[in-house]
C-alpha cells in the first residue's frame, strides 16, 4: 500500500541528503521548552524591546510562515504553546533563504537565539541559527473540515491541532493520578491482574476470544477485574485496587467503547454502605482537585459533587416515576409495562427482577442528573453479590448515576462458596437458554472462595465516563486517546 506523501516534500528530503544534511537527526539540545520560556518571561514582568534572555535553544512544530523580504516571522508550537520566531537575513546569512526552500508547515525545527518583545508586545525569539529536526511528508490538514471519525482515527494530528482534544487528555490523566493518590491515602495498594484469562468473569458481557498457541487453548480478554482482585482479598490483602483496560465485545456508541478503562477496588471487612461513603468522598476529592470546585457544567446541567449524594432504592425510584408501588404490582402488570415500552429483559427471561431492572433503565436512569446512589437491586441482576441482610429477594448492590449515565457499580461481595456455586450454575442454565451475557462457571474462583474470603465491599468505576463529565464531552470517543474505529477509516487517505 503506497503512502500519500507529498512528492515535493519527499524531494526536499532527497535533496537535503545529497547536500549532506540529515532531515531526521538523532538529537537536539533544548535548553528551554516553549512553555518554560513563557513562564520565565512572564515572571520577569519586563516587556523589553531589547533582547533580555540570550542563547535560548528550543524546538517546535511550524504552524505559520510569514515571509517579508529580508525579515520574516514564523510561529512554532509545542505542547499546546506557541512562540513567534523573528528571522533576519543579516543574522542567518545564506540559511535565511534556505529556510523557505526546505522548511514548511508541520515540520519540526530547533532554533537558537535571543528573547525579546516586538513593538506590538508579542514575545519573540530573534533566531541566530536553526536546524530541521523532522521533515513532515504530509501537509497538515484543515482540521476544522474533517469529520469526527477521521479525527478519532488520526488522533496524533487531532492532539496537535485541536486544543480541546489535548486538554481532555491532560485532564484524563490528572483524574487518574488523583484517584490513585486518594486511594493510597486510604491505605489501598495497587495491584495487577491477568488481561488474558482462561475463564472470563466479573460482569455480564460478551468477551473477545483468542487462542494460546503453546497451550492450544482458547482464552479470553478480561471483561472485568473483579474475580482476580477477590483472589488477592482471599490471599490476605485487605485493601486492593487496579486501574486497567477491560474488553467487552459489544456495542460502540456515545457512552460505550469495547476497550475501556476501569477502576476496581476491594476492601476487606467492609460492606456496600462503607463503599458508598468511600465513593462519595473519592469523587468529591477528585473533582475538587482537578477543577478547583465541587461543581461542574455538563451540557445544560450544573452537577454538584459537594454531597451528600442522594440515596434511594431501585424499587422506590421506579415507584416514584410510575406513581405506583412496584412491589405491589403483579408479574403480568410488569409484562404489560415491558410491552408498552417495547422492552426485552436480559436473555429474554421474563422473571420479575430482570423486568424491574429493565424498566428502571428505561424510565428512571435518564432522570438522574446529580450524583445518585441507586441501592438494593433484585437478586436476579447479578450472581456475585451478597443477598440483602434484611430484604429477601434483593442484593446489597448499588450503582451510581450522574447525568443519566451509570458511572459506578458496587456490592457487598458474595463470599459464600456454596451459594456462589449455585448462582454460577443458574447462570449457565440462562446461557443454555440463549443469554449470551450469562456469567460462565468459574470452578477455580469457587475453589478460591472455599478457602474463605472475609466480608468484603467492592467497587467499579468507569474512568472514561468520569472524564466525559469533567471535560463536558458527550461522546466517550472524545476522552479515549485512541477509540475503536473501523480500520477502513484508519487507512483512509487524508
Swiss-Prot record:
Signal peptide (UniProt feature, chain positions): none
CDD domains, per the entry: LysRS_core, LysRS_N
Annotated Pfam families: tRNA-synt_2 (PF00152), tRNA_anti-codon (PF01336)
GO CC annotations on file: cytoplasm
Principal location: cytoplasm
GO MF annotations, alphabetized: ATP binding; lysine-tRNA ligase activity; magnesium ion binding; tRNA binding
Details of cofactor binding: Binds 3 Mg(2+) ions per subunit.
EC number: 6.1.1.6
Cofactor: Mg(2+)
Binding residue positions for Mg(2+) 1: 399, 406
Keyword Ligase: yes
Entry-linked SUPFAM superfamilies: Class II aaRS and biotin synthetases, Nucleic acid-binding proteins
Cellular location(s): Cytoplasm
Binding positions (Mg(2+) 2): 406
Domain of life of the native organism: Archaea
GO biological process, one term: lysyl-tRNA aminoacylation
UniProt keyword annotations, A-Z: Aminoacyl-tRNA synthetase, ATP-binding, Cytoplasm, Ligase, Magnesium, Metal-binding, Nucleotide-binding, Protein biosynthesis
Reaction catalysed by this enzyme: tRNA(Lys) + L-lysine + ATP = L-lysyl-tRNA(Lys) + AMP + diphosphate
UniProt xrefs under NCBIfam families: lysS_bact, PRK00484.1
Family: Belongs to the class-II aminoacyl-tRNA synthetase family.
UniProt cross-references to HAMAP family, sorted A to Z: Lys_tRNA_synth_class2
Name of the protein in its database record: Lysine--tRNA ligase
